[in-house]
């Protein structure tokens, strides 16, 4: 995923910084450096659930950061992330149907128990959603399976 992101950014002429997780305050310190006067604005693209959650907590927890972070995009569909999307802290999320993922995991476990040797690759569809699609019928069962 990282390679695809960097290729798109380079093609479009954007500059970027890849920040691997180091310590507990790695992302916070990078975001703080972004908010200095004259630094312009930045977009944060978090490539996994943990990074998305942490970035959303940092950006959403400060009235100042939102002025300099023009967009936060990430991965995941936990209720806390959907809430941050609804509040506007997160601009877009890539989500995958977790019910389908669980179903396929059980299906493969049963096949392994029954000693079926056929191994096949499974593909799950991912969707990019923004705030206006949170309550869309198209994604309702996937995003809110218990409601």
Predicted regions and their residues:
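Hydrophobic alpha-helical segments within soluble ligand-binding/sensing domains
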Residues: 1-3, 27-28, 76-81, 96-114
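Short, solvent-exposed amphipathic alpha-helices that sit
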Residues: 1-15, 30, 54, 58, ...
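Short beta-strand elements at the ligand-binding edges of bilobed clamshell
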Residues: 87-99
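Short beta-strand elements in bilobed, periplasmic/extracellular small-molecule ligand-binding domains
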Residues: 5-28, 43, 125
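Hinge/cleft segment of the Venus flytrap/periplasmic-binding protein
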Residues: 98-147
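Hydrophobic alpha-helical
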Residues: 22-83
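A local structural motif
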Residues: 13-19, 67-69, 89
């Amino acid at each position: 995923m990282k390679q695809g992101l960097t290729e798109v950014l380079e093609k479009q002429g954007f500059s970027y910084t890849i920040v691997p997780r180091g310590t507990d305050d790695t992302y916070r310190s990078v975001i703080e450096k972004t908010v200095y006067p004259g630094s312009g604005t930045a977009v944060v693209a978090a490539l996994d659930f943990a990074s998305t959650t942490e970035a959303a907590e940092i950006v959403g927890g400060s009235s100042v950061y939102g002025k300099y972070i023009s967009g936060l995009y990430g991965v995941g569909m936990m209720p806390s992330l959907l809430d941050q999307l609804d509040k506007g802290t997160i601009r877009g999320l890539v989500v995958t149907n977790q019910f389908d993922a669980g179903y396929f995991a059980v299906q493969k476990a049963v096949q392994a128990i029954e000693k079926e040797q056929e191994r096949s690759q499974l593909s799950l569809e991912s969707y990019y959603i923004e705030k206006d699609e949170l309550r869309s019928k198209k994604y309702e069962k996937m995003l809110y399976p218990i409601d």
